[in-house]
Amino acid sequence: MDKKLNEAVAALRPQMVAALQRLVRRRSVEADPLPGKPFGEEVDACFAEALTLCHELGFETTDMDRYIGWCEIGTGDEMVAVLGHLDVVPEGEGWHHPPYAAEIEGGRLYGRGSIDDKGPVVASLFALKAIRDLGIPLNRRVRLLFGLNEETNDRDVLYYKAHGGEIPVLGFTPDGEYPLINGEKGILNESYAVQLHQTGAWQLDRVQGGVAGNVVPDYACAALTAPAGASLPDAEHITVTAIPGGYQVEAVGVSAHGSHPEQGENAIGRLVCYLDQLPLEGDAKQAVHFLAEKLGTDPYGERLLGHRLEDALSGPMSCNWGLIEGDAQHLWVKLNYRYPVTMERADCQPAVQTAFEAAGWALDGQVHKEKLYYPAETPLVSALLEVYRDATGDNAPPKCIGGGTYAKMLPNVVAFGPLFAGDPVTEHQPDECIDLERLVQNAQIIANAIVKLANLPLE
C-alpha cells in the first residue's frame, strides 16, 4: 500500500462524507421514463448531482444520453473501469432513521444507497481525486462509470455497450465483498400470471406484497369476501381485521437481500400459506394452493424443482418470491432465482416454467443474467487480491456469491468490496448504513487497486 496515497485519501474524509450525504438525500428509485430521463425524474436528479460533484472536484464528465455517465483520469490507449451505480431499491418499511436524511449516528451514515452503492461510488471518486492530485503515473486511463439501472435491468450498461462504449481491459465494481468475488450465480427474474374466475361465497378480492423482486418481502396483505358470520383462524405473524363484506389479512416477515432469501422470512409465503387454509373455491383455490405448495417460504426452489440444485463452489440455488399482485380476476407473481456457477440455465429454468404452466399460469416476463467465474490465478483476480491482502493482512481466498453485480455486464471485471468479513449486511434492508471508517478504508483500497491495475503488465 502506498502510504502517501493512503494519507491523501484519509485527508479527504470530510469531503467524502459531505458528498455521500448529498447523494443519499436524493431518492433514486427507478420510475417511468420521461423525455430525456430514461429512468425517471429521481434517478436523473441524483445523476445530475453526481456530475455536479465531479465538476466541483475538477473532473470532466461524459453523459451518454442520461443512461450512464463517467469521469476519467490518465492517458493511454487502454482503459481500466470502476463501475458503480446510483440507483437504489425502494426504501420499504421499518426504518428507525429516515431513509433519505443521511443521518450520522455512532460513526455510521444511514440511508438507502449508503452502502449499495453510493458510498462506494463516492469512495471511488475521491480515490481518483487523490491519485490525480498526487500526480501518480498511470499507464492506462481510469474511468469511473456512474450506472443508473443496476437494481433492475442493467439497461444503463446495455445502452453503453450498444452505443459504442469502450470496453475495459481490466476493471472492478465496488458492489460486493472483500477479499474479492470471482464467481456470481446466474440470475433469472421471472414473472407469471394467471386469470381467475370466482363465483363462490369466499373470494379473493385483492392481494399485494413486496417492494422488488430481489428483496425478501417483509409485508403482504390480502382482502377477502367472506360469508356473513364467518371467522378466520389465528396464526403466528398474521393479523386479521374485519372489513365490510369480509376480512383483511396481513402478514409480516423479515426483509433480506434476494440473493440470500434464507436470511429473511418471506411475508408473501406466510400470507399465501395462510390463505391456503381457507375455503376459497375454483380458480382462486387452485392458484393459491399451487403457490403455497410449490413456493411457500422455501428459499431454495426445492419444491419447484423437486430437488435441491447446488455445487461445491457456490452452494445451493436460491429462490426469492419477491412480489405478488392480484385482484378478483388475476394473480401475478415475480421470482428472483439464482443458479450455481458450475451449472446452466437449462438445469433449472425449464422445470420452473413447466411447473407454473402445468398449473395454468403463463410466463409474463423474463430477464436472465449469465453466471460468471474467473479462476483465482487470472491476472485481474491475483492483482486485486494482492492489494487487499497488503491492506489488511487477510489471506482469505476469493469467493462465489449469489448476488449479481455489474461484473456480469462487461468482460474483464469482478466485484471487489465494499463489505469486509463481519460487517453488518444492510443493503436492501431498513436502516441501511455505512461505517465512515470503512468508507475511508474502501477509498484507500480502491485508490491502490486503481494504480495497480492501471500499471499492470498484460501479455
What are these regions (language model features)?
Residues 62, 261-328, 338-350, 361-459:
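An extended, acidic, His-containing surface patch that forms the Zn2+-binding/catalytic region
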Residues 21, 51, 122-129, 158, ...:
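Predominant activation on well-ordered alpha-helical scaffold segments within soluble catalytic domains
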